[in-house]
Each structure stands twice: as C-alpha cells, then as structure tokens.
Design a protein with these regions (language model features):
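OB-fold nucleic-acid-binding modules
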Residues: 1-13
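Divalent metal-coordination and catalytic microenvironments
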Residues: 17, 62, 167, 248, ...
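N-terminal intrinsically disordered, cationic/polar leader segments
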Residues: 272, 290, 294-313
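Short, acidic/hydrophobic/Gly-rich beta-strand patch recurrent on exposed beta strands
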Residues: 35-40, 203
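Divalent metal-dependent catalytic cores for phosphoryl transfer on phosphate-bearing substrates
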Residues: 151-153, 162, 173-291
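Acidic/His-rich, divalent-metal-binding segments that scaffold phosphate/diphosphate chemistry
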Residues: 92-214, 254
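OB-fold single-stranded nucleic acid-binding module
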Residues: 22-32, 43-97
C-alpha cells in the first residue's frame, strides 16, 4: 500500500483511502468541484476533484475509495489532484490500514496509569479513580483506544490514554518540584481530566463530534460524570469534591479556550499548564512529521499562531 506519509510532490497515485470528508465547492470561475479529506493510518491529505467528469464515480464521506491522481503542493503541504474515483469493494482493503494509532504500547501505558492509582494515598481520590478506570470495564476499554481529538493533537487510536498519562507524568514532576502541590489531587485529576472525550467523540473510523459533544462538550460532560461517581462514594468530603470538579472545569485555563472556570487552585493552575504543554508538544511533533525533508520552516500554524522549525542540534 502507498501510505500518505510516503507521498511526495509529483507522485502519481492509484490507491484506496478512507474519505473522511467530502465538501462541494464552486470556483471563482463558477465551476463545481469537490474538496476531500483522505486518510490512512499514517495521516491525512487534502484532495481536490476539479473536473466532475464520468471518471468520478458516486461516493460519500466515510466510504473507502480508489483514487487516481497526482500529488501537488499547496501552501507548503501535499495535496492530491484527483482525476478518477470509484468506491472500493469489500475485500479490496484492510480497515487496519486506515486507522491511525499511537506508536506506544496501549496495554503498557494502561499499566502505568494503574500504577499511579495504586500509589495514591488519599482513599477518596483512589476510590474515585478505581471507579473510573477499573470498575467500569466498558469505559476503561473505550478509554484505552479512544482518540484525544478530532484532528488537533493525539487524534488517533490510543491518543486519549497517551495524552492523559503524559499530563499525569508532567503533574507528578510538578508535585515533586513544588511541595505545595497535593500530588494525589493533581495526578488523579490529570488522569481523568479528559474522560468526557469518550462520549464527546465517536469511535474510529468516524472520530467526529457526537451531538452531545457539540452541545455540551467534554469538560462539562466529564464534570457531570465525576459528580455522579463522587456521590456514590460514602463520606466523600464536600470540599474535596468541589476541588476535584474545579480542576476538571478549569483545565483549559482560560474562558476563551473553553474552560467554564478559570483556575482558582494551585493544582488547577498546574494541571492546565501541563495539559497545554503536552498538547503543544504533540501538535509540534505531528507538524514536523508531515514536513517535507527539504523544508526547513513550516507554513503558518494556526494552532501555534506562528511558523515553526526544528532546532539545529
């Protein structure tokens, strides 16, 4: 199979890809065309069908399609100029080739998560973590393979677990550096800070926002679930319950970034910084992975609000 990550400008392509999105458009000359997003397990590529001829068969978004065309460059990124399309038939493709996945061992990461829970001394936080990640086996199974985003960072199978574990590790290092931070509170809140994404985003291959995800969002969805689980634990201290929910509600840091509350606890401040750091590190890494070998600087990156390049050493 010719993977998207291996495509270069000028390449002729005849391959089956998953059509994630299909949008009709009209050029400035009044001609109709299609904009597509094509995906395999190595990434995505923008596709353009400029000529809607008989060579373009009927297909819809989320179909597997055989495309023929040429790779061009547009604003520093690869784009596929498509001349022919037909819907792929069963047996012509293996779905595993089209599901992007973490490079890390999922079971190994989940064992690390469980080890963090076992180290927790606060009985209420430990019980809450066990309810989420151990007792609710359906949730745990989904959490392990879910993505953390539709497209921004960790948008692949195992991405949610990878991101949550990384944020928890950063928070653990913060707690070691700053003794005024409560380790149990910040690390446990890091592990479950994005738990709402299991319901906010649908599973692969769609990996798109659900109706509840669009209307409510993962932060509020996670806080609602936390509140319900906390009420099931006898004697859970009300102040601690509020602190747990606050860390969830404030983990995006700023109101304009989607947080219903700004951080008002040390642990909430540190968690929001750790979350932002890991997201930006992964975003940077994913951009660099897609960068052409002969390209030093990237194009303007809206998510980072600047152009970027790798360091020289």
């Amino acid at each position: 199979m010719r993977y998207i990550s291996d495509l270069h400008e000028g390449d002729q392509v005849s391959e089956i890809y998953l059509c994630k999105t299909k949008s009709p458009g009209t050029s400035k000359f009044g001609k109709s065309y299609y904009s597509l997003t094509l995906q395999d397990k190595t990434g995505m590529i923008d596709g353009k069908v400029w000529e809607l001829t008989n060579a373009i068969g009927h297909f819809e978004a989320m179909d597997y399609i055989l495309v023929r065309g040429q790779v061009t460059s547009y604003q520093g990124s690869n784009q596929l100029n498509i001349q022919q399309i037909r819907k792929a038939q069963e047996g012509e493709f293996d779905m595993a080739d089209y599901m992007p996945s973490t490079k890390k061992d999922i079971d190994g990461m989940f064992k690390e998560l469980l080890a963090m829970i076992s180290k927790t001394k606060n009985q209420y936080l430990k019980q809450l973590a066990e309810k989420i990640f151990i007792e609710d086996k359906n949730f745990a199974r989904e959490f392990k393979v879910h993505s953390a985003a539709k497209s921004v960072h960790h948008g692949y199978i195992g991405g949610l677990l990878e991101h949550s574990l990384s944020v928890a590790k950063i928070c653990e290092s913060y707690a070691n550096l700053y003794p005024q931070l409560n380790r149990d509170l910040i690390v446990m809140c890091a592990l479950w800070h994005d738990m709402g994404k299991v319901e906010e985003l649908s599973s692969f291959p769609e990996n798109d926002y659900t109706d509840e995800g669009q209307l409510v969002g993962h932060i509020v969805m996670g806080a609602i679930k936390l509140d319900r689980l906390i009420r099931e634990i006898p004697g859970f201290p009300p102040k601690l319950a509020n602190e747990v929910k606050h860390c969830m509600l404030a983990h995006h840091g700023e109101l304009e970034f989607g947080s219903p509350k700004k951080p008002a606890l040390l642990e909430a401040i540190a968690l929001s910084q750790a979350d932002n750091l890991d997201a930006k590190m992964e975003t940077f890494a994913e951009i660099m992975e897609e960068q052409k070998e002969d390209q030093e600087w990237s194009g303007f990156q809206r998510l980072l609000d600047t152009r970027i390049r790798k360091t020289s050493i």
